[in-house]
Amino acid sequence: MDFALSFEQQALVDSLEAFCKRELYPHEALVEELRYVPDDIRREIRRKSAEAGFEGMNLPEEWGGPGLDKQTKMQVERVMGKPSAALGQCMNRGVTGILFKCRGEQIAEYLLPSIRGERRNAFALTEPGAGSDARAIVTKAEREGGDWVINGVKQFISAADIADFIILTAVSGVDQTDKGP
């Protein structure tokens, strides 16, 4: 299999790399010191990335993304892995894959505002006894009437302090199975 990029693919990757060097890297020291991206910088990066055609590069085509092939997407992710993740999120990269599973009212409430940059999410998976091992999760979600009641402890939730909503993982089954509760 030939992994060489076409001229167009390489041009996209090179221009994205130049954009990151020009627009993201200069803010890294400040973001590291503050431990967050100030709103004015976030808005500026978002505006400039949209103008340059780089906003939402990881989005599927049906949700406004460029519909990159896998090889180009891999190279885009390689380039975007170099600057601070917090700064990369400013380019509309904070749309967690699970949001694309939204249905009905969830699309208008969570997915579309996240794509537009109006709402930010955090992902709560890690627990004291379950790092990234989803099968070790003990936080429970139980139905009470028409509501879900969550009982458990989560930790190390990146961006929880600035998120508009949190996507939380929990077990909801009552019976132990070979795949967990």
Name each model feature, range by range:
Residues 129-137:
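Active-site-adjacent elements of ketosynthase-type condensing enzymes
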Residues 139-142:
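A structural signal for short hydrophobic beta-strand segments in well-ordered beta-sheet cores
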Residues 1-11:
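Intrinsic disorder at enzyme termini
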Residues 15-25, 48-52:
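N-terminal glycine-rich anion-binding loops that anchor highly charged ligand groups
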Residues 151-181:
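A short core secondary-structure module
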Residues 28-36:
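C-terminal helix-coil-helix/basic helical segment that borders enzyme active sites and/or dimer interfaces
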Residues 117-125, 169:
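A short, Trp-centered hydrophobic/proline-enriched beta-strand micro-motif
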Residues 50-118, 158-165:
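Internal helix-loop-helix
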